Amino acid sequence: FTVSTIHESGYEVVELHDQGSGTRVQLYSFGALLNAFTIPTKTGTINGIDGFTSINDAVANATAGFKSSKLSPFVCRMQHGKYRFNQKEYTINGFYLGEHAIHGLLFNAAFDITYTKSTATEASVIFSHQYKGTDPGYPFPFTLHVKWKLTSGNTLQVFTTATNNHSSAIPFSDGWHPYFTVGETIDSATLSFTTNKQLAFSADLLPTGKTIEDNRFVGGQKMDGIFLDNCFLLDNHSETKHSCTLKNDAVTL
């Protein structure tokens, strides 16, 4: 396994490489995002991530879909960008889609490479960003560490650690917004979840706090003709049970 880094347009592009299988992972320090996960198959290589063409493309189009973005310190939509914490009202000054703030404050942040490791069994990198509380609507400093680890069997893992740098507890949530692809139209792919609980959204895609029974994906559902812009409440993850699987005849993610 190897780790290599090049500089591009003021950022770092990191590649994790399994020399045995040929699997490659491309990561940007811009947003600590996963831009490519290239996997050898019987019919050639497939990139399982719908990424950007370059760093410049990512910088220019980060909010046009938030492809592979890290979502911190809040995920999805926040109604009118407002929330209440410890009896005080705050209004986020981040990115708004329509009337509502969306997908946190670090999706376009510059991360530093703080650790790399390459051995016979893994290639890994840690990106870190120190948020200093600069948004008046979120004056709570924290440090976000994002670790990407490639091991044998085309296994890629992401670990996120947040360190509270404030003097007391802070409001915080974290997520990831990947765009997966199986190398062709999604209509030929099958999607399965370990849940039948879909989160209910309002017309503005804000969570209502309710769930809807949706059994379509428990045993696997072909995506032909299906539109999804929803969240599902997954069962507890375990090392031996995949929470979500997307596959076609060529590749399984």
Predicted regions and their residues:
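Active-site/ligand-binding surface loops and adjacent short beta/alpha elements
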Residues: 169-170, 179-253
